């Protein structure tokens, strides 16, 4: 049986998805929750979001500082090296029976590599997905090959994980964790949200989250400039920007947001909204725009439209509530016009989130409770 379950989180968004599962592990008398916080959680630039974990009542067993001040490719490579080394030492100290990882970030790849050489089994969540415009795609599939148990969100993802050579008996279709978070959190009302954030919602409101497209041929800052040029035409719209991630080009995008907000009274910028405020904002805005996975995984549950810019999420399963457009000003303007059209509103109202209707955290917990360490540590390549 599993005893000590170590959950590793490297970003604010990732923790928001894991929180409900962590609560379930923590309250199980037969399991011991261990938490490692790393990556942007420990960075002042990203709002020291490890504090959100502690504010939720969790004890962080180990903090591993790996983030460099620069987001250049050499510095990200060094960050990954620090992550492997730091996780290796943490695993030696904590001696977990199972490591739980989510997603496709390079911090998570580092943790998986450290677990591999330490011979500690890994449970990976949200594997098998495709995002052809980012190197996260290769990282995700690499993490899959270093993992022993797979909790996937869709049937297509389940088939892909098996196609990668994983035993079908180790791949569990549980749905998306993002839907769980929405179903199990008390959202703030509009006025309450305005007071907490110091903003004023207008007749039209948009949430903007844009990350670097790491495999794109066009520089991330050029793509983002096209978005800002398009948003310049919407002076009657409240624009709420969130922080880009720590990939190469993220710091340039952050600077561009700060400069835009300084000259636009209808624009606001937050390093970290926290899960409750973030989901509450989605509930209040007309739609989201950018290239974040949240626009595909979570926003459809709110029956809100998503404008997905560029190829960062190319290949990921989508709801009919998603509008895809090129990272060009005119294309983005047309997408915004479509977002506010009556016909598209009807489509959104009848759309379905392909990542399920909730319950993933409980499904994952029930499977972890029944795992046998002897069985899951034996891996062979499964041929189709």
Language model feature labels by segment:
Residues 1-384:
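Nucleotide-activated sugar donor-binding and catalytic core shared by glycosyltransferases
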């Amino acid at each position: 049986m599993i005893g000590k379950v170590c959950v590793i989180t490297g970003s604010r968004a990732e923790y928001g998805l894991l929180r409900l599962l962590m609560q379930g592990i923590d309250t199980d008398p037969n399991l011991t929750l261990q938490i490692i916080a790393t990556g942007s959680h420990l960075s002042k630039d990203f709002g020291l979001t490890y504090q959100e974990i502690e504010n939720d009542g969790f004890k962080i067993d180990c903090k591993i500082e790996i983030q460099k001040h620069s987001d250049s490719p050499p510095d990200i490579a060094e960050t990954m090296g620090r992550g492997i080394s730091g996780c290796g030492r943490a695993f030696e100290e904590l001696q977990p029976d199972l490591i739980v990882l989510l997603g496709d970030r390079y911090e998570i790849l580092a943790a998986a590599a450290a677990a591999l050489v330490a011979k500690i089994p890994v449970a990976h969540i949200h594997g098998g997905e495709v995002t052809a415009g980012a190197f996260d795609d290769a990282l995700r599939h690499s993490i899959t090959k270093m993992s022993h148990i797979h909790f996937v969100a869709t049937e297509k993802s389940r088939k892909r994980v098996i196609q990668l050579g994983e035993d079908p008996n180790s791949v569990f279709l549980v749905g998306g964790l993002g839907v769980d978070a929405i179903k199990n959190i008390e959202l703030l009302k509009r006025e309450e949200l305005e007071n907490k954030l110091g903003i004023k919602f207008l007749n039209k409101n948009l949430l903007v989250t844009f990350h670097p497209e790491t495999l794109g041929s066009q520089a991330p800052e050029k793509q983002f400039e096209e978005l800002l040029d398009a948003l310049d035409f919407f002076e009657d719209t409240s624009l709420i920007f969130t922080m880009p991630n720590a990939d190469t080009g993220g710091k340039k995008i952050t600077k561009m947001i700060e400069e835009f907000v300084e000259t636009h009274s209808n624009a606001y910028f937050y390093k970290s909204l926290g899960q409750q405020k973030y989901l509450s904002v989605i509930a209040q805005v007309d739609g989201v725009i950018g290239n974040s996975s949240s626009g595909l995984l979570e926003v459809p549950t709110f029956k809100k439209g998503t404008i997905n810019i560029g190829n960062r999420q190319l290949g990921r399963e989508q709801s009919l509530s998603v509008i895809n457009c090129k990272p060009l000003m005119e294309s983005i303007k047309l997408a915004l016009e479509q977002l506010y059209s009556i016909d598209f509103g009807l489509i959104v109202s009848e759309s379905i989130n392909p990542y399920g209707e909730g319950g993933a955290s409980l499904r994952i917990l029930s499977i972890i409770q029944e795992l046998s360490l002897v069985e899951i540590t034996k891996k062979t390549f499964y041929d189709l």
